[in-house]
Swiss-Prot record:
Annotated source species: Chlamydomonas reinhardtii
PROSITE patterns: RIBOSOMAL_S8
InterPro entries named in the record: Ribosomal_uS8, Ribosomal_uS8_CS, Ribosomal_uS8_sf
Protein name (database record): Small ribosomal subunit protein uS8c
GO CC annotations, alphabetized: chloroplast; ribonucleoprotein complex; ribosome
Purpose of the protein: One of the primary rRNA binding proteins, it binds directly to 16S rRNA central domain where it helps coordinate assembly of the platform of the 30S subunit.
Subcellular localization(s) per the UniProt record: Plastid, Chloroplast
PANTHER family cross-referenced by the UniProt entry: 40S RIBOSOMAL PROTEIN S15A (PTHR11758)
Length: 141
């Protein structure tokens, strides 16, 4: 059994691990399992930012398989992450809430904001469509 220590902000930790793994061109990244992290991974998969995710048998870890696209450059190909940026919006010390009308749009809708609503986690598009607001957890593009 691995000890992950005390993590005050599991979402911030998850985003940092994904960001660092993308910069290092890793194929996958392991994250401490929480239901919230699993729900975020599910949205990232649905929106095409990651290939897939998997929960370990002992439910201690969440493994995310990262997604890259090939970018042709002079003499060869370069792996480019499907995730350009991950940014934490609401933080443990400063929570950010919004009603459905005021949820910010990321890059004219090409990026997403993950919103924690009374009906669960969803993208900003889905929250606007359903007419519900909530806590703005993070943006991804």
């Amino acid at each position: 059994m691995k000890s992950h220590g005390l993590i005050n902000d599991s979402i911030g930790d998850m985003l940092t691990r994904i960001r660092n793994a993308c910069l290092a061109k890793k194929s996958s990244v392991s994250i401490p399992f929480t239901r919230l992290n699993q729900n975020i991974a599910q949205i990232l998969e649905q929106e095409g930012f990651i290939q897939t995710y998997q929960v370990s048998l002992d439910s201690q870890d969440l493994t995310i398989r990262l997604k890259y696209r090939s970018k042709k450059i002079y003499r060869g190909k370069k792996k480019e992450s499907c995730i350009t940026n991950l940014k934490r919006i609401s933080k443990p010390g400063l929570r950010i809430y919004s009603n459905h009308k005021d949820i910010l749009r990321i890059l004219g809708g090409t990026g997403i904001v993950i919103v924690s609503t009374p009906e669960g986690l969803m993208t900003d598009r889905e929250a606007r469509l359903r007419g519900i607001g909530g806590e703005l957890l993070c943006s991804v593009w």
